[in-house]
Amino acid sequence: MIRPRMLRSLLALLLGATTGCTTIQLGAANLIETAEVPRTEVAYGEGPRQRYDVYRALDSIGRPLTTPAPVVIFVHGGSWESGDKRGYAWVGEALAQLGFVAVLPNYGLMPSTRFPEFVDDVARAVAHARARVTEWGGDTSRVVLMGHSAGAHIAALVAYDARYLATQGTTPAILSGFVGLSGAYDFLFDTKLLRRTFAGPPEREHDALPVHFVTPRSLRTLLVMGEDDRTVNPRNTRSLAAALRKAQVPVEEIWVSGTHGVSVGAFARINRGESEIVRRIAAFVRATP
């Protein structure tokens, strides 16, 4: 039998003290998530990855809520070239147990889907889910977009660059806030991965950086970052927070000890009961803008 202290240490190693989020790490979090949460898969387009999972909000004893619940649309990471919504089922189940409707979309991945097409996918999923979320008990006045790592980058573009949701006939005003977990928002194209994904004409590189699209009308924002992150430089969070403050947009920051997985790892079952990250994100989601 694995004792709780041993399990906590293992999960801390896998999710908090690593340089990235691998299949093994995600599998560990899924393994210990034992809740039975109603899940529905929905197609938002015709592509094989144009689908999202919906997790119904639960009350304190595990029953589906009967009153409208806040909604969190969570975009997974994976360096724009890997990852899957089912690998993050534990995040959807955690959000549901916190009393939220959780929507986890897949999106096209590199190299078959290039920038900005994968951002278009997420915008399409956001608009589609927002239009239907009352079917699953969601409160349309409280729909927060959240992402981790590359998913935070994509989600930030959808949240701040109004052109993406405009192609879906709507605006970022349908959202009540943005939460970024260890996200890339203001970076140099100084690695093979980043050049392969984003480099090109100046306008393309400009459009790849969420920090360029902050305005006084931008969504209120909560940013979470590990102080020792070596996968995404913490300067990304500092730069975005500074731009938001300059535009007088409400922004909160949570800085914690740990590396790249620590922000999303807070939602793992063994962590979330005492996590400041989870507590503050939950309060942010529940708040009425």
Q: Where is each model-derived feature located?
A:
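Mobile cap/lid helix-loop segments that gate and shape the active-site cleft of serine hydrolases
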Residues: G47, G183-F213, L219
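C-terminal catalytic histidine-bearing segment of alpha/beta-hydrolase fold enzymes
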Residues: R238, R245-P289
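Primarily recognizes the serine-hydrolase "nucleophile elbow" in alpha/beta-hydrolase
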Residues: A127-L193, E205-H206
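Alpha/beta-hydrolase active-site loop
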Residues: T113-V133
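Short beta-strand/loop motif that positions the catalytic acidic residue
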Residues: R217, L223-M225, D229
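N-terminal cap/lid segment of alpha/beta-hydrolase-fold proteins
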Residues: T22-P64
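Short beta-strand element of the alpha/beta-hydrolase
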Residues: T66-G78
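Short amphipathic alpha-helix adjacent to the substrate-entry channel of hydrolases
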Residues: R86-L104
